[in-house]
Amino acid sequence: KYSFPICFSLLALFACENDGIDVDDIEVPAGFALSAGTATNFLTSSYAYDRSADWITGAYDKRFTRGDKLYDDIRTSSNGIGGGLGPVYAGYSCGSCHRNAGRTQPTLWSEGGSGSSGFSSMLVYISRKNGAFFQDYGRVLHDQAIYGVKPEGKLKVEYTYETFQFPDGETYELCKPNYSIYEWYADSIKPEDLFCTVRIPLRHVGMGQMMALDPTEIEALAAKSNYPEYGISGRCNYISERGVRSLGLSGNKAQHADLTVELGFSSDMGVTNSRYPEEICEGQAQVNQGS
């Protein structure tokens, strides 16, 4: 009586693993190239960006698998392997916000704000109107916390809808979010003193490719990307990291030189590491609550 579900599951698994097209089967027209060269895959499932290239084997395949587990496995608040979550956080794994290296639907839409089950999949940036941070808070509002610890606050969103018309008379509707923060862990911040920006997760696609490119190639492509008629001027973003000027390649608006500078482990999950050894809530009451 269990044969049908098992067969169906196997069929679904194989359908996701192989869509029947291999890179060797593709004839590329002159003047064109595959987006990832020989690493291009042709899956149409949600796992298309969450797999290694077909030719990755041996030690490199093991390295990819270990990195993929590090990315997807849920963090706990223990001190052992796979631990380190909190005391405050926004998501409990990289994959929780970036499902299959893509985007996870944020609770901003499904629950109208902060998630009710220890997960939100969004970042709430808070600051003063002049850009300075508040003394009892960092740059991100951590709306989740481990057991026994109070989150920094909770986000609520309400939407207003407005109807407009195209020149031909066809109507369309725009949705405007109105954010508010409640249950502040310390002194409440007045709305008129607060600048709040809510961001949904970015896709984590092609970062390894960017790291492998020669910086001069990126600079040459940027120089060609000039379209003044559209108000577009291609230019690279240069950043200073540890006193060294580098080409920005990763992060929001290319603000980081490489993936080691990504703040996700520290800022989003509260996991300390060799790059960011301090707790994300250093100096706040949650440090003692979570110890």
Language model features with spans:
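Positively charged n-region of N-terminal signal peptides that target proteins for export
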Residues: 1-2
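Extracytoplasmic redox metalloprotein regions
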Residues: 42-43, 49-63, 73-291
